[in-house]
Amino acid sequence: MTRTATQATATEGRLAWSPRRGLTGADSVGSVPALGERLAVADSWLLRDGRVRGLGRHRERFLRACGDSGGPSLRQLVDFWRDMTDALPHTGEWFPRVELGAESRELRLLLRHAPPLGTGVRVWAAGQTDPRTVPRRKGPDLDILGRVRQRASTEGADEAVLITPSGLVLEGATSSLLWWEDDTLCLPSPQLPVLAGVTSALIQERAQRTGVRVAHRERTLADLEDREVWLVNALHGIRPVTEWTGGTKPLLRAGGAIRAAEWRQWLEGLMEPLE
């Protein structure tokens, strides 16, 4: 599949990869691969007019996760990634996802248009205990996290925050959690079951380069009241929490988004052309 041909005919759908044929065949976005097969590994990012942020980091995370879960050989993973990158469209806004099937061990590319992007986020703060089975790897728990987000949506929220049984905040269902305590950028302890987020890592590195103190802290939802809190991921970038919703429980007050705009502008500047 050549890059030129793919750009001219890019449509939403799923492409399966094999060493001999490369990427072939596409089914509808709404279908379920391999009779509802669970994903062993997944990774995704925003692609805007052929530009992407931190693609090399997504590659590293995906290849490492595939290796940790007994996936294809490194050579096959590298070849898949090359073919996948060549197949990405260079016009429009997309949210592609790379996948490794849990049973079939099949490598796939899901091409889908990006949903509307947000600059702020309403968060369900009822305290959703973390339901994941493999929290440090993206893929196995996407379905259950999707159900968590659906529940949050019924409460008028865009996202839900996961907590430990003892009430410590972890991350969003689809995003990393960061917050500010005075001039310190904070995030959950690495000892807690959180996913290593690409966007979160970029933000932490910028903070360290510019002299902003970064600290790992254990906090409950109540501790985040009146603080500037960000949910960050590869799709939306930085979204400050604009409202905490909690159904019948008392609502937390959202802090002002004092720093978010400047950091969002910096993050947007990291978009680079596909190689």
Where are these regions (language model features)?
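A contiguous pocket-lining binding segment that forms or flanks enzyme active sites
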Residues: 184-204
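Alpha-helix N-cap/helix-start motif
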Residues: 55, 170-171, 196
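Conserved alpha/beta cores of soluble small-molecule-handling proteins
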Residues: 1-161, 165-166, 200, 205-275
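Glycine- and Gly-Pro-enriched alpha-helical subdomains that act as flexible
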Residues: 168-190
